[in-house]
Amino acid sequence: MAEQESLEFGKADFVLMDTVSMPEFMANLRLRFEKGRIYTFIGEVVVSVNPYKVLNIYGRDTVEQYKGRELYERPPHLFAIADAAYKAMKRRSKDTCIMISGESGAGKTEASKYIMQYIAAITNPSQRAEIERVKNMLLKSNCVLEAFGNAKTNRNDNSSRFGKYMDINFDFKGDPIGGHINNYLLEKSRVIVQQPGERSFHSFYQLLQGGSEQMLHSLHLQKSLSSYNYIRVGAQLKSSINDAAEFKVVADAMKVIGFKPEEIQTVYKILAVILHLGNLKFIVDGDTPLIENGKVVSVIAELLSTKADMVEKALLYRTVATGRDIIDKQHTEQEASYGRDAFAKAIYERLFCWIVTRINDIIEVKNYDTTIHGKNTVIGVLDIYGFEIFDNNSFEQFCINYCNEKLQQLFIQLVLKQEQEEYQREGIPWKHIDYFNNQIIVDLVEQQHKGIIAILDDACMNVGKVTDGMFLEALNSKLGKHGHFSSRKTCASDKILEFDRDFRIRHYAGDVVYSAIGFIDKNKDTLFQDFKRLMYNSSNPVLKNMWPEGKLSITEVTKRPLTAATLFKNSMIALVDNLASKEPYYVRCIKPNDKKSPQIFDDERCRHQVEYLGLLENVRVRRAGFAFRQTYEKFLHRYKMISEFTWPNHDLPSDKEAVKKLIERCGFQDDVAYGKSKIFIRTPRTLFTLEELRAQMLVRVVLFLQKVWRGTLARMRYKRTKAALTIIRYYRRYKVKSYIHEVARRFHGVKNMRDYGKHVKWPTPPKVLRRFEEALQSIFNRWRASQLIKTIPASDLPQVRAKVAAMEMLKGQRADLGLQRAWEGNYLASKPDTPQTSGTFVPVANELKRKDKYMNVLFSCHVRKVNRFSKVEDRAIFVTDRHLYKMDPTKQYKVMKTIPLYNLTGLSVSNGKDQLVVFHTKDNKDLIVCLFSKQPTHESRIGELVGVLVNHFKSEKRHLQVNVTNPVQCSLHGKKCTVSVETRLNQPQPDFTKNRSGFILSVPGN
């Protein structure tokens, strides 16, 4: 039941009326209309009264109020029924449909648009781009179909002149993924003629009023509506629709949907062709038919992308094949006009069907695999023409009203008849409620061999000239005694009916008088093959594809096509079967008055609609019946988690007993009845409470399942990880063993090799052993080095260590380190180097040893020295393990300067073959010298000096910084300067010269 509104608005649900009577029903309907409450429930059926004004009840805030809510939680609204259909589809994976019914002008088309907008608004919360694209196209398709399929009538400014059923496809998440549109019986006769006060289809007026001057010029059109015969009748009529604005809306919608520019242009050309066809005038010159305004033919040919003479021939002649002979039969003026009008109607119908097909191609569900994406469910929305009674009712009204009879029959079957029969079949106590079953009227129209459609088809198939009067006579003879059929012949006193013209059908919605004139022609729907060939031979591929049957040979014999009435009957039967397979939801639309006024509520007019829609009977069945029924098995499958007696499985004798236990556990036993195979629930509130309990339990069930499943996944992951680690461990062990074995094999016996295995190539280690390999190679290299060292005499070891130190510090930075010769170290005491003065130096060295108590002599050599005053002198350096002495060899090696080794911070040498060396001191009084030897001359001693000093410092666990650079940076008494080295030819010995930045050491060249 609906949420209770204030009493000033009446009853929100007709089921809540104190007494079920027509006066009370009408009083409540009037009160709610006058208070602006246009929607009222009958249980789960929405009764909608057309307000004839814009109401602010469809915005985003209203959508949020109804989203996910149950019917009884909010006041009556279209959104409530749309949400109910959506929830049923999503919860139970069941196809649903929303059937909107009512007579023309009752608001069906607007209702369908609001339902579509609501479904679009509540879906795709994650804003997936593809879903948004589909939703946008589904919504945009409405305005395109309205432009080409709707028209202004005396009862409705936007009347649907075709039937539309749209299936919206949803994925398992409940998001729209596509759709499909079925269209039924376009009223194409409106293209060429309209009743007074009515217009043709909106598309013509939109093109003329909204098209640009350039576009209209290219189509040979002008904005004046009265210039075109086919639409002149409605040219001066006022409409609530802004044609110019709607033209742009429709054009934009076609682009959004996916129509190509050339397709849109072809659509405009077809509309222009129809308007030009209406202006063609035929005259007869003797026996020859002619077109009075021949220029129009050229325009039509240009727009159809064909030749003017072909267009003219198709309009004036008809090609007839008799055996092998082909004859061009001239038309009379009347036949030419008939052919032109038939051509115009056919072109428009093909255009409309092509638009629907094109939209379907674009919005159809693509690449959807149910095994991957889950079940594809559907919500169908039926917006079809309402019941029509005009001053002049023809073939179109006959088909439309037959359609409404079929839909009313479906409503009776599902809501009134089947429901009561099901109660009796299930053994539920029930008092039968009488209702009018319109099956007799449906049979009157569609029954095989006896119905009106069968009689009409028989008349159309007769050989010779068959008139509408002959068809009416056949109706009189075969249906004259039928209770719902009458004519002037069967009711001679009824002067409303014209002789040989009218017949009356007593429909469920009231009596309708039909004029038989035009029935035969409209049922045959004749279009000469010449026009089909003309269109097929167009150079415009869009037009060509619209007329595939035009490719047939002139002499080819084709099967007689089904008549328009039979095609419509078959489509209605298929539609009803489709709707019957879905769970239905109803919107019953009521037209409050015929003046389109928002203030007038015509009691008599509304009462008549309430009666023929069977709304009062609907209330009675709803009050006495049950809102929901389900088989015990399915009910238990959905709600068994609510009770501990049924979860996860019950041990009771039957599913029925288990359902009883569950219902009693929840305390709903007074609101249900138990049938033979189904449970019946009276009020929606009980069902919604069950859904709430289920939703609460589902959280716990899902959490439990998640816990179990996550635990299972964790255990599986742990086992897989453990197994993988075991495999990795054993594999690594295997690789390590293999590597060790291979190393052992390759290096077996290296102790007996001359190079102790230097040439042996190491095997590639596993990634995990790369650091181990480095350590192993280091150990091997140490061992090999130790083996090599064992062969060196103990007296040579200091020299070897010094050479190693020199290599570490200078290798790759200086060309000649003097490694190939023996290092003497104390060259001043060597007779070959200083034959005259060596005897003088030795006593000085001994005295210094006594005085300074040094242990070892590290290095001594003659040098050339430069001081801060740029004075160059021959000197000698004497390096012990404690001091560096600068001596004057000309004064019997007198000590000129003593530098403690702890005051020495580093050495700088050049990267050439020269013997430049700078001793850096802590007090920034660097010593700049160039080593030189007398025998042999130019011997390189830099490597030896660096090696012995670095080795000595290392033995004392101190670091000596050695720089290799050119020029060399130094400091003389705190002043920064540089010493660069240059090679000069004809230079007898190294010499220093002054420059701007410091000094230049010139050394002899080759």
Swiss-Prot record:
Detected in enterocytes at the intestinal brush border membrane. Detected at the tip of intestinal microvilli (at protein level). Residues 812-1005 form the TH1 domain. This is Unconventional myosin-Id. Residues 9-695 form the Myosin motor domain. GO terms for biological process: cellular localization; early endosome to recycling endosome transport; protein transport. Keywords: Acetylation, Actin-binding, ATP-binding, Calmodulin-binding, Cell membrane, Cell projection, Cytoplasm, Endosome, Membrane, Motor protein, Myosin, Nucleotide-binding, Phosphoprotein, Protein transport, Repeat, Transport. It comes from Mus musculus (Mouse). The keyword Metal-binding does not apply. CDD domains: MYSc_Myo1 (cd01378). Pfam families: IQ (PF00612), Myosin_head (PF00063), Myosin_TH1 (PF06017). InterPro entries: IQ_motif_EF-hand-BS, Kinesin_motor_dom_sf, Myosin_head_motor_dom-like, Myosin_TH1, MYSc_Myo1, P-loop_NTPase. The lineage of its organism: Eukaryota, Metazoa, Chordata, Craniata, Vertebrata. Residues 699-719, 721-741 form the IQ domain. The modification Phosphotyrosine is found at Y536. Signal peptide: none annotated.
